[in-house]
């Protein structure tokens, strides 16, 4: 309630432990189902959305049952959790790049963090492959701000890793545009380049449906129809 009074339109709930904090494990349940339900109901009462950081099987299921709009990370997801998401329309924001980025710099980051990132990496990808196979809806997100996970280059790596999980380039692009806008309740203005919506778009030299690495160079970014970045 306090965060929403301050202007938050999405409430993120820490349903489980994580990789970046010492003294906890990704599988640790940090909020039980009743606690999650109380927060989700408050967000939805205001017409806002609720997301759950959930990296363990039990925490994921608690989050889905509580009615969150999305589950971030979804590591250690099993078939039951995937089917629950599919039945309830819960969206996954994979953030595959977050532990990947940590694992690229093992010599400069805290040992506890690197150890956990290495432990979850394979399970993270396996969970996304399961979700893709089941047909769970995805919305692209990077968890930017975690170590070596920046706002400039992480998106391309995330797109490539989502493709590695079994999504087609078209599905990946849909997750990064239409699906993200729908999840955040901004699809009236964003997510598609159509009449009546904001002219936010990227012009590329190459076709991303052929190679998603097209986003990594030779691009022009337009915001509300105005060029704001060129490489």
Predicted regions and their residues:
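Catalytic metal-binding/acid-base residues of hydrolase active sites
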Residues: 55, 97, 145
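His/Asp/Glu-enriched, well-ordered alpha-helical/loop segment
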Residues: 45-49, 109-112, 121-207
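Histidine/acidic residue-rich metal-binding segments in metalloenzymes
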Residues: 1-92, 118-138, 188
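Small/polar (Gly/Ser/Thr/Ala-rich) solvent-exposed segments
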Residues: 210
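Active-site loop ensemble at the mouth of alpha/beta enzyme cores that anchors a bound cofactor
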Residues: 95, 99-116
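Short aromatic-centered micro-motifs
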Residues: 221
């Amino acid at each position: 309630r306090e965060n929403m009074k301050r202007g938050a339109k999405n409430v993120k709930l820490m349903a489980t432990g994580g990789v970046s904090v010492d003294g906890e494990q990704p599988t640790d349940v940090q909020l039980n189902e009743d606690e999650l339900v109380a927060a989700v109901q408050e967000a939805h009462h205001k017409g806002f959305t609720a997301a759950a950081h959930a990296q363990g099987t039990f925490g994921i299921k608690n989050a889905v049952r509580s009615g969150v709009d999305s589950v971030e990370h979804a590591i250690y997801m099993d078939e039951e959790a995937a089917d629950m998401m599919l039945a309830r329309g819960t969206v996954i924001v994979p953030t595959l790049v977050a532990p990947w980025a940590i694992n690229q710099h093992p010599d400069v980051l805290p040992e506890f963090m690197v150890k956990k990132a290495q432990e979850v990496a394979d399970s993270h990808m396996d969970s996304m492959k399961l979700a893709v196979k089941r047909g769970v809806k995805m919305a692209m997100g990077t968890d930017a701000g975690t170590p070596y996970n920046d706002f400039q280059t992480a998106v391309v790596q995330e797109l490539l890793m989502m493709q590695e999980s079994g999504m087609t380039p078209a599905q990946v692009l849909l997750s990064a545009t239409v699906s993200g806008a729908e999840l955040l309740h901004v699809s009236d203005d964003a997510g598609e380049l159509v009449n009546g919506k904001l002219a936010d778009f990227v012009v590329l030299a190459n076709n991303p449906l052929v190679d998603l690495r097209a986003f990594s160079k030779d691009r022009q970014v337009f915001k509300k129809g105005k060029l704001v970045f060129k490489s």
